[in-house]
């Protein structure tokens, strides 16, 4: 969404599990592999023109060298600064959850 920050992710392919989708999308967008730790929430949100369902997971990186390919800009942001970034409405719910629960990103 133009001018807003988003978490890495994307659309699930047919016959793909949520975890397989997450691993594929992170590899495609960031060039890294991950260990999925836990699913933390599902968000269903309706915008004016469309609806989205977001599934948020906690993960850890298997490799530290990030090579983003599908984003204009990326940053590591501390929990204390995360709320300063503009996110789409559905993502704001995830930001609130991870900052309240002090989950590391």
Language-model region placement:
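Active-site-adjacent beta-strand/loop module that shapes the phosphate/pyrophosphate-binding cleft
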Residues: 33-35, 41-66, 75, 98
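Short capping/connector residues at structural and topological boundaries
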Residues: 6-12, 17, 52, 57, ...
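Generic C-terminal helix-cap and adjacent flexible tail
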Residues: 99-105
